[in-house]
């Protein structure tokens, strides 16, 4: 699966879990951040660094969604395999 397809599937998964996904430029003086999960006014939000590579955005989004219980969520086989490998 290519990076664009994987990122798209991760974004769909996040939305199905009630997580808003935003792409914003993150300017951090001391180091680079690809983004991450936060909670704002009781709602989950993933902010992806729009200047990050697709690979870094995939990492940040995967790291966010694996915090949630995915056992009862239908995932395409390629996405489930990726997340299983990612969480190991």
Where are the model-predicted features located?
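A sequence-level detector of short, solvent-exposed, charge-rich linear segments
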Residues: 29-33, 40, 77-80, 84
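Auxiliary, metal-adjacent structural segments of Zn-dependent hydrolase domains
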Residues: 1-33
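Generic preference for well-ordered secondary structure
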Residues: 5, 21-24, 42-45, 49, ...
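Short, exposed beta-strand "edge-strand" segments with a Pro/Gly-rich flavor and a Y/T-containing core
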Residues: 15, 24, 51, 67-74
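C-terminal structural segments of small proteins and small subunits
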Residues: 61-86
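Active-site scaffold of zinc-dependent metalloenzymes
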Residues: 31-55
């Amino acid at each position: 699966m290519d990076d664009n397809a994987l990122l798209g599937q991760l974004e769909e998964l996040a939305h199905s879990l009630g997580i808003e996904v935003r792409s914003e430029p993150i300017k951090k003086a001391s180091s680079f951040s690809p983004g991450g999960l936060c909670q704002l006014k009781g709602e989950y939000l993933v902010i992806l660094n729009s200047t990050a590579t697709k690979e870094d955005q995939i990492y940040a989004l995967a790291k966010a969604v694996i915090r949630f219980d995915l056992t009862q969520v239908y995932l395409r086989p390629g996405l489930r395999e990726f997340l299983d490998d990612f969480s190991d």
